[in-house]
Amino acid sequence: MAPLARLSRQLGVDFVNFSYSGQGKMEPESAEVLADCETDAIICYCFGNTTAQQVEERVDAFVERLVKSHPDKDIIFMPPYLNCEYSLNLVKRESVLEKRAVITRKMTALAKKYKNVYFLNIKDACGTDLEASIDNSHPNDLGFDRILKSYGPKIAKILKKHGIK
């Protein structure tokens, strides 16, 4: 079971998953769907299959649209879970490291700019042993356990701060 589904059960809070099978890449249309939702908070895992260039070009407008529509709601962003710098694929490793640098730079600035935007930049959320993934891209059960342990308490603390369980 996915980490946010498990966290939903632990906290007694409903999550609606607008999953696009890894194809949600911060397009304006995705921002519009989220902007139109009545919600108490938004948790975005939207960087998985993006490129560094896509993050550079899209993240500011994406976040701005969400903040404009939900100025008093928590908007929490999570970077890719897996650390492919441990990968044996050197091309993938360099690509992921470049993307992570862009995500960290952009999201750190956006979290400073907007009081309700959070960037949970947890390094090694799945560990460094390569046991938490089936292919160094998709978490397995152990990976999901580690993700939940890494992000769950931080998400719960943010939500609780605003009266959500």
Residue ranges and their predicted role:
Residues 83-121, 146, 165:
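Substrate-gating cap/lid alpha-helix
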Residues 45-54, 90-98, 134-142:
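The substrate-binding groove and active-site-proximal loops of carbohydrate-active enzymes
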Residues 34-44, 71-72:
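Proline-aspartate-enriched helix->loop->beta-strand connector
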